[in-house]
Amino acid sequence: MHELNQHKIAALLPQRRAQSNKGNYGSVAAAAGSLAYRGAAALCVESALRTGAGLVYLASVEPVIQLVLTRTPECCALPCRTDADGGILAADAAAVRQRFTEKPAVLLAGPGLGPSAARILNALLTADAKWKAAVLDADALNALAAGELGQFPLLPTNTVLTPHPGEAARLLGCSVAQIQTDRPAAAQELAERYLSLIHISEPTRQE
């Protein structure tokens, strides 16, 4: 187990070369947002851009994309149809997965997906998916904890889970107090259970 802080993480970010372009710095495909939770997608896109991704694609419903493009016009839009719950239609999520088969990207999924999360994730995480890595947060973690992604979820080899203490408790089937009592042990158990890298964030509200 390795303890990271903001200084160590900053040192890991590659320096930009003077002679380079956005194609030299990788791609992120974000599946985020829904009619009810639009701001989550904006935060996803901005975070990916600020940490150095060369190309950031957003797969979401049209009203969410319109909002995000007013804040980050450099984002590449992948408009999706809206399902009955106001989220991304699963068939369109499958098309997003297929789009990145030949030119793999990092998948960022979960924030703001709402009740559609499990359907979307099951369309994105299939045996033939070619994601370089995946970062799963928020509603993706709730779907994972509820068993809606199957007994053996098809997570990419380089998957990062970023639960807050409440989400970590749901993933492990324990109380938030148990998570907070020994966060390193909880992170270790999550890593072993889901074969993923784990970052347990600080609580943003009273859990």
Give the role of each language-model region.
Residues M1-A134, N142-V160, P165-S201, R205:
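Small-residue (G/A/S/T)-rich helix-start motifs and N-terminal tracts that mark the onset
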